[in-house]
């Protein structure tokens, strides 16, 4: 059984998909042992508590304190959050990490210590529309502006780059001529739920095979 930590910044609908799959499948190869958030108001933390899953808040303010957080650079905050997240994963003995709507770019030792054991969900068909600044609504706006005929989501391994790791799962949807960022998001969200579960299952089975 693979113990996973799920990192979430928002409402946690993809986290809920992972929770629901685990609870409804006795043969599920993963167990969510921890939910980590970099936002104190993330509803994902409530979802975790309702499911009896341990939570850790690793926002820059929580980690550094108000004064230091406000004075820190973007890279300093990213490293502080990443290091706190790594400590949380070690504390709860997480074998792997699933980024399910996580906004802070991870950096530092966590990338090396969990190499090949971190996957991320991205709301576009990588390698298109990835990299710095490409998250949430920004991605959907860019897809529509580029007049793409299709979009979707990608689950990929995390490396030291931004949205550059090897791809595990992709799900496609059509982009309609009258789409807005909101309508496109609504069409992609259900396939994100499918993709994140598929990605977690693939990760769990691969790591189990490697151990065997």
Describe the residue ranges of each PLM region.
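One-carbon transfer enzymes
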Residues: 1-212
């Amino acid at each position: 059984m693979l113990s996973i930590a799920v990192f979430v910044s928002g409402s946690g609908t993809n986290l809920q998909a992972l929770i629901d799959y685990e609870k409804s499948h006795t043969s599920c190869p993963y167990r969510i042992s921890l939910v980590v958030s970099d936002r104190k108001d993330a509803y994902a933390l409530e979802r975790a508590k309702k499911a009896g899953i341990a939570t850790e808040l690793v926002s820059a303010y929580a980690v550094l304190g108000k004064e230091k957080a406000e004075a820190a650079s973007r890279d300093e905050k990213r490293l502080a959050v990443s290091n706190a997240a790594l400590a949380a994963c070690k504390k709860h003995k997480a074998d792997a990490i699933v980024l399910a709507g996580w906004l802070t770019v991870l950096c530092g030792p966590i990338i090396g210590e969990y190499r090949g054991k971190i996957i991320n969900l991205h709301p576009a068909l990588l390698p298109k529309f990835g990299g710095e600044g490409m998250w949430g609504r920004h991605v959907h706006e860019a897809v529509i502006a580029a007049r793409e005929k299709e979009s979707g989501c990608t689950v990929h391994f995390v490396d030291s780059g931004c949205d550059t790791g090897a791809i595990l799962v992709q799900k496609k949807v059509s982009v309609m001529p009258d789409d807005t960022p909101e309508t496109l998001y609504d069409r992609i969200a259900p396939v994100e739920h499918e993709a994140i579960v598929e990605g977690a299952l693939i990760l769990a089975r691969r790591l189990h095979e490697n151990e065997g």
